[in-house]
Swiss-Prot record:
Source organism per UniProt: Prochlorococcus marinus (strain SARG / CCMP1375 / SS120)
Chief location category: membrane
Gene that encodes it: plsY
One CC-aspect GO term: plasma membrane
Residues in coiled coil: none
Protein's GO biological process: phospholipid biosynthetic process
InterPro entries: G3P_acylTferase_PlsY
Parts of the chain that traverse the membrane: 8-28, 57-77, 84-104, 118-138, 143-163, 164-184
Protein name: Glycerol-3-phosphate acyltransferase
Compartments where found: Cell inner membrane
E.C. designation(s): 2.3.1.275
Keyword Cell inner membrane: yes
Reported function: Catalyzes the transfer of an acyl group from acyl-phosphate (acyl-PO(4)) to glycerol-3-phosphate (G3P) to form lysophosphatidic acid (LPA). This enzyme utilizes acyl-phosphate as fatty acyl donor, but not acyl-CoA or acyl-ACP.
Subunit structure, interactors included: Probably interacts with PlsX.
Amino acid sequence: MDFSISTIALFTLLVSYLLGSLPSGYLAGKWILGIDLREIGSGSTGATNVLRHVGKTPALFVFFIDVTKGIGAILIAKSFLLDESLQIAAGLASLSGHIWPVWLKGKGGKAVATGLGVFLGISWQVGLGSLGIFLLILSIWRIVSLASISAAISLPVLMLINSKETFSIPYIVISFIAMILVLWRHRSNLIRLIKGQEPRIGKSN
């Protein structure tokens, strides 16, 4: 049976969204402590809220799963030999699923770990570069949101540097969109950072 490129593209976008929607953090909270992370702390189902309210080991598993969701979306698109525009569409579908999961009535995470996965899938150099910036900022200030915001802001710069020889407009575009999404999801954190009220690792929200 032959499938048109549009059918394959729609299938890829749907699978990428559903993959991104996998509520790993929510499930960790429910299965381990019987809590709903959407009602605790930052209200996010991401790894940071899991770390603060469930524990280090569950947070590491959630982080790994969320990164894998982003990588998976890009690899699925690449496996179908879809072009760069459709690859970034798959990445954005995965990010959208993570932020607005259908299973949790649209209340999910902040797109940091899944975003890392997307960029590791697109360009491992950019993905590792942003991860390095995240870890550097985190080691100095011990504030996860500041590290996440810094890593997000670095994405367009890293992508531009990495694209000197093979410039890709779609990849540049997704780096800006991902940055905006992460900043928007961290808008309350930004306010607390400005006020000097953002908690460091080891303290609750």
